[in-house]
C-alpha cells in the first residue's frame, strides 16, 4: 500500500499504537481485498524531531479536519482543508513529500462530487489489490 499513498512505510492501527516517539499520519480507512473489516492505516513520516515541530502539529490538526470532512461527505470543506494541508506540509522540516497523498484525496473528492457515495457511506475505501 505504500506506493498507493506515496509514503514509504505504511502500518496498521495496532502497530501504530505500539510505537512511541515516531511521527505518524493517518492515511485512510481501508478494506483490503479478501478482508471484511476496514482498518485505519498510518504513514510513518519520521521520528521524535518531527513530532516536536509546531508545523507538524498544525499539519496533523488540518489533516484530521480534512479526513473528518471527507468522511462526512463535506466535499467543499474537505477540499479547503486539503489545500491547507498541502501548504503546511511544505513547511515541515524533514517531512517526506505528501503531494501524492493529497492528490489521491483530491481525485477521490472530485469523483465523489460527480458521483456521491450515498447516505450510508462510512468513509471506507475498498482497495482492489493488497
Regions found by a protein language model. Give the residues of each.
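Intrinsically disordered, low-complexity, charge-biased linker/tail regions
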Residues: 117-130
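Cytosolic regulatory/linker segments at or just downstream of nucleotide-handling modules
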Residues: 2-77, 81-114, 118
Amino acid at each position: 500500500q505504500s506506493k498507493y499513498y506515496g509514503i514509504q512505510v505504511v502500518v496498521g492501527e495496532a502497530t501504530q499504537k505500539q510505537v512511541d516517539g515516531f511521527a505518524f499520519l493517518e492515511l485512510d480507512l481501508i478494506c483490503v481485498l479478501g478482508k471484511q473489516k476496514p482498518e485505519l492505516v498510518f504513514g510513518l513520516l519520521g521520528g521524535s524531531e518531527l513530532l516536536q515541530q509546531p508545523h507538524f502539529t498544525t499539519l496533523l490538526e488540518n489533516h484530521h479536519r480534512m479526513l473528518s470532512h471527507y468522511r462526512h461527505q463535506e466535499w467543499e470543506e474537505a477540499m479547503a482543508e486539503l489545500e491547507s494541508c498541502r501548504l503546511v506540509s511544505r513547511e515541515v522540516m524533514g517531512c517526506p513529500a505528501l503531494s501524492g497523498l493529497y492528490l489521491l484525496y483530491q481525485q477521490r473528492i472530485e469523483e465523489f462530487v460527480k458521483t456521491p457515495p450515498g447516505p450510508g457511506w462510512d468513509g471506507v475505501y475498498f482497495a482492489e489489490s493488497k
